[in-house]
């Protein structure tokens, strides 16, 4: 008897394009959300677009967050309850969106994602990443009811944020390899459809990296669509597996041990070079990944990340301890092997 079932939660509306920030109110109205929202943002996005957003919601209050933490989630929950908010609208990059996602889940209300930078696929996924001390927690939550991404605003975001978003997507290539490996060796649940969507999205950016240029709104359009596809793949899978493998463990370990960690997307991009070599050896696709990252202006070396070689090696040899997720790292890569991989690929 077949008894398998799945529950796929996806955004109901996705609106991408030039000037669509002014359509947030309309998009929310189409969702039939009653009442008044609480707007969640951080200082820079608020200065950039907060007034345009507030103009679409009479009487909506705003909470501004400075740091990502579980305490900040609690503050948003308290502010929403005090204001009688019936849903949340998050404006900004990863921080406000991740925090609003968790707060909405705790409140049992919906939320709308309004990204101002194409920095990572959390703008559409059902996962939040929240630091606590030297640990970063990946927390499951419902995805946004709607995503409204204004490519004009995103094209004017710091270019490093866009290249980080590109690198985050490109790293899906190795994340899917880890997922398939875990299915074969550990019998983890696997979705061929989610894996194919994630892999196709990564390959699309690798193949078109030369066309992604600073200042081009078309580049923000391409990257935004890729981030949406990656987030949808995670929703279909019901986990972050399609977009998070050993390269993410490597990045999370860098967050813990590096004196000045780089952007998340940049770290997973470099991690993807290393883990692709571990998967496929010197004739694998690590050069294609490296060349794509170079084409968009993302880091490909420890020096370009601003992290010393020793810390990169330590992160690679200890990344498997971050969480109980089987990847190509297995029970750990020894120091000699890590140095060989990082040296051969030019990371150090």
Language model segments and positions:
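Solvent-exposed alpha-helices and their adjacent loops that cap or buttress functional pockets
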Residues: 6-8, 31-32, 81-83, 104, ...
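Short glycine/serine/threonine-rich phosphate/pyrophosphate-binding segments
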Residues: 46-49, 95-101, 120-123, 243, ...
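A glycine/threonine-rich phosphate-anchoring loop and its flanking beta-alpha core
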Residues: 106-201
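A short, small-residue-rich loop immediately preceding and capping a beta-strand
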Residues: 82-103, 107-118
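Active-site segments that bind and position negatively charged phosphate/pyrophosphate groups
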Residues: 192-295, 300-303
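ATP/NTP phosphate-donor binding region
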Residues: 1-87
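C-terminal charged capping/lid subdomain of soluble metabolic enzymes
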Residues: 169, 281-348
């Amino acid at each position: 008897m077949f008894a398998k079932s799945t529950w796929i939660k996806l955004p109901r509306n996705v609106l991408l394009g030039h000037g669509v920030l002014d359509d947030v109110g309309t998009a929310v109205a189409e969702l039939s959300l009653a009442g008044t929202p609480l707007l969640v943002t951080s200082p820079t996005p608020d200065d950039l677009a907060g007034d345009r957003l507030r103009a679409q919601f009479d009487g909506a209050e705003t909470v501004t967050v400075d740091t990502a933490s579980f305490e900040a989630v609690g503050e948003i929950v308290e502010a929403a309850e005090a204001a009688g908010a019936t849903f949340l609208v998050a404006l900004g990059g990863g921080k406000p969106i991740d925090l609003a996602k968790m707060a909405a889940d705790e409140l049992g209300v919906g939320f709308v994602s309004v990204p101002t930078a194409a920095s990572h696929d959390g703008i559409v996924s059902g996962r939040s990443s929240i630091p606590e001390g030297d640990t970063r927690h990946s927390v499951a939550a419902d995805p946004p009811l709607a995503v409204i991404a204004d490519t004009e605003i995103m094209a004017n975001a710091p270019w490093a944020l866009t290249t980080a978003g590109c690198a985050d997507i490109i790293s899906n290539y190795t994340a899917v390899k880890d997922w398939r490996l875990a299915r074969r060796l550990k019998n983890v649940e696997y979705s061929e459809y989610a894996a194919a969507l994630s892999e196709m999205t990564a390959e699309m950016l690798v193949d078109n990296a030369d066309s992604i240029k600073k200042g081009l709104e078309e580049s923000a359009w391409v990257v935004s669509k890729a981030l949406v596809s990656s987030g949808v793949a995670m929703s279909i899978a019901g986990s972050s597996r399609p977009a998070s493998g050993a390269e993410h463990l490597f990045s999370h370990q860098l967050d813990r041990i590096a004196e000045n960690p780089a952007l998340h997307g940049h770290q997973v991009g470099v991690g993807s070079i290393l883990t692709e070599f571990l998967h496929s050896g010197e004739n694998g696709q690590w050069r294609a990944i490296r060349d794509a990252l170079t084409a968009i202006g993302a880091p490909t070396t420890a020096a370009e990340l601003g992290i010393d070689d020793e810390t990169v090696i330590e992160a690679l040899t200890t990344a498997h301890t971050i969480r109980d997720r089987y990847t190509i790292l297995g029970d750990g890569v020894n120091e000699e092997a890590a140095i060989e991989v990082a040296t051969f690929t030019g990371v150090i």
